[in-house]
Amino acid sequence: MSNRKYFGTDGIRGRVGNAPITPDFVLKLGWAAGKVLARHGSRKIIIGKDTRISGYMLESALEAGLAAAGLSASFTGPMPTPAVAYLTRTFRAEAGIVISASHNPFYDNGIKFFSIDGTKLPDDVEEAIEAEMEKEITCVDSAELGKASRIVDAAGRYIEFCKGTFPNELSLNGLKVVVDCANGATYHIAPNVLRELGATVIAIGCEPNGVNINEEVGATDVRALQARVLAEKADLGIALDGDGDRVIMVDHEGNKVDGDQIMYIIAREGLRQGQLRGGAVGTLMSNMGLELALKQLGIPFARAKVGDRYVLEKLQEKGWRIGAENSGHVILLDKTTTGDGIVAGLQVLAAMVRNHMSLHDLCSGMKMFPQILVNVRYTAGSGDPLENEAVKAVTADVEATLGNRGRVLLRKSGTEPLIRVMVEGEDEAQVTAFAHRIADAVKAV
């Protein structure tokens, strides 16, 4: 990955108006991608976006670049990231492109590619696109230029796909659900999916205006959802992020239910139904309570590096079907190819209905350990804090004290000069003190 100039672990992302998220760069990216993808045969590309105002500008730039390379673009309009992956597969398109910065504020945006089978583009294709970016743009002959069209029934197709992942013999009749769409790409999808399955739906975060995506709503800020669930005396709340690939839930008492708990519920239900193949994949940040709860059920558990890309890689390596991050990325490979907030939420609802249990009760088999995270800023030129002997000594001392009833994790942020210090254990006061003790050692470097 180190030789990449533009592609990160999750496509290309940045502040709108600053390189690389500028109209001229994105036009050239469209052209370069078009040149590479045209070698593979199909000349159709699916393009979706979330609700950011900059999406209009960037999809026009992509369209021009692709057309110059001789590829035609089919636009979905605002559409969740997993929906674009699904539509890319069903239309047999050469690739899908999503214009989104997921859970980031509106002033950021990004470009992410899906391959013909709805998974991330292979590394060699990304590298070939980067190589084309170094060349001058050339236009194909006029008769060969690409066209643009709109997929008018994209939302309806995806709504039916989501409903198809919910067991036919079950219904959501009698359930009152608050759904928070983060003023993002699921605003016209998620409420309809839930209503058509029989739920009484109260929708919030469903009034996008181009600049309010993820603003005090959605999976990264569930306070509005918690308040509304309690006010409406709802059975539960579902929060999606701006592009619909994350889900966080709220039980009828207003308690947050994160990605670890959601995976626990889905894995346990899969085991009960005899449908669980292998184990479950979490990340280095997954709560120790998840690991212990799965162990009690006899379900194998493996940790991947933080990032849904790495969860997917670990699933493929082990041949397992279910993985998640505590942030709410839940990957269910027996249902779809990528993290899908709506689909994951539906599997939890199915477990509630089938077992006649509340979300609160479904979570009760898993005891969450207190997990304290402290971010410490460091100066890039002052040496690597993770290699510092004093930091190592304090960390080893804390680990020895915790034994097998806790964990310590130190890692660098992928985007900022931060060291993330995470300490987990049974006693919140103790782990808080330990986390700050290690953080102080990092600061002293």
UniProtKB/Swiss-Prot annotation:
It catalyses: alpha-D-glucosamine 1-phosphate = D-glucosamine 6-phosphate. Binds 1 Mg(2+) ion per subunit. Mg(2+) binds at S102, D241, D243, D245. Its cofactor is Mg(2+). Activated by phosphorylation. One of its GO terms (cellular component) is cytosol. The keyword Phosphoprotein applies. One of its GO terms (molecular function) is phosphoglucosamine mutase activity. The modification Phosphoserine is found at S102. It holds the Pfam family PGM_PMM_I. Keywords: Isomerase, Magnesium, Metal-binding, Phosphoprotein. It comes from the Bacteria. One of its GO terms (biological process) is peptidoglycan biosynthetic process. The active site is at S102. Its EC number is 5.4.2.10. Belongs to the phosphohexose mutase family. Catalyzes the conversion of glucosamine-6-phosphate to glucosamine-1-phosphate. This is Phosphoglucosamine mutase. The lineage of its organism: Bacteria, Pseudomonadati, Pseudomonadota, Gammaproteobacteria, Enterobacterales.
